[in-house]
Amino acid sequence: MSYQFIEVSSKEQLDKVFAFRYEIVCEKLGVNELDYCESGRETDEYDAYSVHFAAFDEAGEVAACTRLIHHSPIGYPTTNNMEYDTVTWNFDQDSLGEFSRIFVSPKLRSIEKLKPLFNSLKTIGNAKMVDLNISYTLGSLEKPFFRLLRILGFPYQRIGDLQSYVGLRYPCIMYTDELHSANPEMFKDTSVT
């Protein structure tokens, strides 16, 4: 079965996403310092400013998820929790977003399964970034995941040193136009305004 990301469009789907996040974050990763793991759901203050995406299996269960935080009046996980040179990396808040809570079921963690899954995320994520006028997208990425995303055609750049934030992570940025350049076969007719 080939999995495809879709935009979460119902409370039932969103509840399944929060339960999947709980399973991955709170149970499998053993991250107990998060304040928002309760009642079998993992949520946080950024969810209110997010568009959620998920891939569902044939039984309707979540196999992968992420969110695109946008136009957040409370900032972003990367801006609020990581250090980077804010003079060099000064972003227009009206054009800024952040992909976070990118989780994939262990059954999909082979490169053969990840490629089509993340190609679908590029397609739907790009459409939403263009629709929301997002020119750049932050991410707090672990070193192996940073490398994997670049292999999969997500041209994130490190904007700071490796630092402790729910494990060791780099603050990163991805420009929407560079996502298009890195994937010309997918975005040949796309332009960012």
Where are these regions (language model features)?
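Short amphipathic alpha-helix that is part of the acyltransferase structural core
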Residues: M1-E42, D47, H52-V62
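N-terminal short leaders/motifs
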Residues: M1-L14, T123-D131, E178-L179
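Sequence-level motif detector for i,i+2 pairs with an aromatic at +2
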Residues: S2-Y3, A48-S50, A63, D94, ...
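Short, His- and charge-rich active-site/binding loops that engage polyanionic ligands
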Residues: A59-W89
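Acyl-donor binding region in acyl/amide transferases
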Residues: T79-Y170, M174-Y175
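C-terminal "cap" of GNAT-fold acetyltransferases
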Residues: V166-F187, V192
